[in-house]
Structure formats: C-alpha cells, structure tokens
C-alpha cells in the first residue's frame, strides 16, 4: 500500500514510465529496458531531457522538426546532445533525405545501414572536408547527396556543386561548419554557371538556424530576429537568381511567406511552414492543392475551424484574410484564456479590456467565436455560388 504522503508527481512518473516502456517494447526488443536509467536518476519526476532521450529514436523527421518549432528547450537540447541515430521515414518531403551515397564496404562510419529502421543514422561531425574530397570520385553520377550533421565546410559544398554536375538534391542541414554568408557569396558569384540542382536543404547551418522557434499557435511573442530575417532574404534572392538547366528556381526548406496578411498583423518575420502545408487539404473552391510556401499564420486564417476546409490564395485574395483576421486573433486569446485564467472574472487582463467578458465565460466566448466563423463561412459560400462558382456535390 502506498504511503499517505505519496504525491501526484509520483503517479505521473508511474504513468509516464508505463507508457514509455510500452512504447519501447512495441518498437524495439532490447534486452535492457531504456526506462530504468532514468527512473534511477530521477526520484519524483522525469525531466524533459530524460523523456526526449527516450523517445528521440522513435520520432521521424516530421515529428522532430515540429518539436523544434514548438519547444525552444527541445531545439537547444537537440543541438547540444550527441544523438547517435534517429528514425527518418522515406515520406519526408516526398524524397529520401538520407540515402546511401557510398557502398557500406567503403566506409562503415559513413553509410552504415540500420537493420531496424532501414535508413542510415545521422552522420557524425568527425566526417570533414578531407574525407569528402577523397570520395569525390565515387560521388560522380549521384543525384542525391546528404551531408546532414557532418563537419564539412563551404569548400566541400562548392566542390560538390562545381565538380558533380548530376547532383539534383544536396542536403547540408545542421552542418555547423557551413556559414550562411559564405554560402550566399558562392551563390552570388556563380551566376555565370548553370547547375542541375533542384533541391537545397540548409536548415540549421550557421546563420540560418532557428534562433527563436515560432510556436504552433502562431504566437506573436516568439518571432524571429531581424538579422536572421535579413539573411533569409539575401539567401533566397541569391538562390532564385542561380541559373539552372531545368529553368525553375532551386527549392529550399528556408523561405518567407509570400502573402501580406502575416505582415499586416505584425508577423513580417514569420517563416513559411512546409510541414504544416503537408496537412492542409485541397482548396474547397478550385479543388487544387496549394504547393507554394505559406506561413502558419496565413494557414490558420484560410482554414475554417468548423468544417476544416481550406481556401487557397488564388481563389480569394487578401480581402478574405482581412475579414476573418479579427476572428482568428479572438480565437487565440480565448483558447488560452481558459488555461491561464480558468473561469476567473476580474483578474484577466483581456476581460478588463472588454466589458462583455465580465459576464461571459471563456467557453461561451469560444462557442460564440465558432458560431460567428461558421456564419461568415456560409456567407462567403453563398456569394461564390452567386458569382458562378460550381460547388462539388460532396461539399454542399
């Protein structure tokens, strides 16, 4: 029987330990349970870094990058910790970001296949320029080269782009030896050459890292710094001006939002979120999927909270964003109001700003917002039908 002073924290520890143990047994059949070292080091609670170290091997690239955007502590922990391996699925960004570029017999440390996941682990920082230069002859003919997490510098990147004309996808994410200014200078000085490069992934290089990750709810408090934003502009302009054989600009995982709604709302430093765009359904009007980069704030403005439909910018312009922008801001305030100030009347700062909030609870306000948004959505639907839009039978 448990003692009377048994705290609720211990119950949470037991619940978390049981859940993590079940997760580890369902994904791996190790002889040793990975939960035991953590429980020995923590008496009454599990630290965030302890939980992260347990579940990091069971997350794919999508989950890891979403955690980096939502938790600043997880971002810095991931940068400082020595993570040996992570599970990256093959559906990330519609390609295989971690492909075996060199036969295993050449260098086991470079491309060791993990039998459990079927993908090689994250590359080590010990792999530097000298090793890449020695392998340039074996890189000939490759179309995808992933140097994520290695200790290479800008010289290796330039040698690969200049000496391997067949490369179409180059990934140098989290290469701390690569400086953004050197990369921008190389792109600006290479306008006289033509490259076959189609994709360039640079998230995490020095100068282009996430200094302040934006929260999932699009909070206006954690915006990116102006210096970071100016480097993104220079890098994107230099990348767009790079001549290519296919005639299209090189796609990158770092980009700005092209719409103006986030800039009007004070979100001019908002980044385009390619991962949230993967979850966005097709446009309810033109039935086309929006492929261009768009920030999380503009996605929220163009998504109906009632029917989960999405309106692309090509169907309805900025006027649609401005009409429901007030509803979106009200929703963010109300959704957090019940957590920060649960059913408190006079102590809330937002309730002091509006007299009607003294008599309406946060839940009632949230319900009122959803009703207003639903009415607004029905009005727009009637206007578009009157203007000649052909509505799908499944959506009527």
Curated annotation (Swiss-Prot):
GO annotation terms (biological process): protein ubiquitination; ubiquitin-dependent protein catabolic process
Localisation per UniProt entry: Cytoplasm
Coiled coil: none
InterPro entries given in the database record: F-box-like_dom_sf, F-box_dom
Keyword annotations of the record: Cytoplasm, Ubl conjugation pathway
Pathway assigned to this chain's UniProt record: Protein modification; protein ubiquitination
An MF annotation (GO) of this entry: ubiquitin-like ligase-substrate adaptor activity
Positions of the F-box domain: 40-89
SUPFAM superfamilies per UniProt: F-box domain
Major place of residence: cytoplasm
Top-level taxon of origin: Eukaryota
A cellular component annotation (GO) from this entry: ubiquitin ligase complex
Subunit record text: Part of a SCF (SKP1-cullin-F-box) protein ligase complex. Interacts with skp1.
Protein name: F-box protein pof13
Source organism (scientific name): Schizosaccharomyces pombe (strain 972 / ATCC 24843) (Fission yeast)
């Amino acid at each position: 029987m448990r003692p009377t002073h048994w705290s609720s924290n211990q119950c949470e520890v037991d619940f978390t330990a049981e859940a993590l143990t079940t997760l580890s047994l369902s994904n791996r059949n190790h002889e040793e349970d990975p939960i035991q070292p953590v429980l020995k080091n923590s008496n009454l609670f599990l630290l965030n870094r302890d939980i992260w170290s347990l579940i990091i091997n069971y997350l794919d690239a999508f989950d890891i990058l979403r955690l980096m955007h939502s938790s600043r502590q997880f971002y810095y922990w991931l940068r400082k910790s020595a993570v040996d391996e992570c599970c990256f699925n093959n559906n990330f960004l519609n390609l295989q970001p971690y492909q075996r570029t060199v036969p295993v017999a050449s260098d086991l440390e470079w491309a060791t296949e993990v039998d459990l996941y079927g993908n090689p682990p994250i590359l080590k920082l010990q792999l530097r320029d000298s090793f890449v230069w020695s392998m340039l002859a074996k890189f000939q003919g490759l179309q995808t080269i992933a140097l994520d997490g290695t200790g290479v510098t800008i010289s290796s990147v330039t040698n690969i782009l200049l000496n391997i004309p067949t490369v179409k996808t180059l990934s140098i994410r989290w290469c701390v030896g690569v400086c953004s200014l050197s990369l921008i200078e190389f792109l600006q000085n290479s306008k006289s050459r033509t490259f076959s490069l189609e994709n360039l992934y640079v998230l995490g290089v020095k100068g282009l890292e996430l200094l302040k990750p934006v929260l999932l709810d699009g909070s206006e408090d954690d915006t990116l710094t102006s210096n970071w934003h100016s480097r993104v502009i220079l890098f994107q302009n230099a990348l767009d001006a790079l001549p290519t054989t296919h005639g299209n600009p090189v796609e990158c995982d770092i980009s700005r939002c092209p719409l103006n709604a986030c800039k009007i709302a004070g979100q001019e430093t908002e980044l385009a979120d390619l991962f949230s765009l993967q979850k966005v359904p097709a446009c309810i009007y033109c039935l086309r999927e929006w492929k261009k980069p768009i920030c999380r704030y503009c996605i929220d403005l163009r998504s109906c909270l009632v029917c989960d439909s999405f309106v692309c910018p090509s169907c309805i312009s900025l006027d649609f964003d401005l009409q429901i922008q007030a509803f979106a801001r009200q929703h963010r305030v109300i959704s957090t109001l019940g957590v920060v100030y649960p059913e408190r009347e006079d102590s809330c700062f937002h309730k002091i700003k509006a007299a009607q909030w003294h008599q309406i609870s946060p839940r009632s306000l949230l319900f009122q917002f959803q009703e207003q948004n639903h009415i607004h959505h029905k009005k727009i639907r009637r206007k578009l039908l009157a203007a000649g839009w052909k509505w799908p039978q499944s959506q009527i």
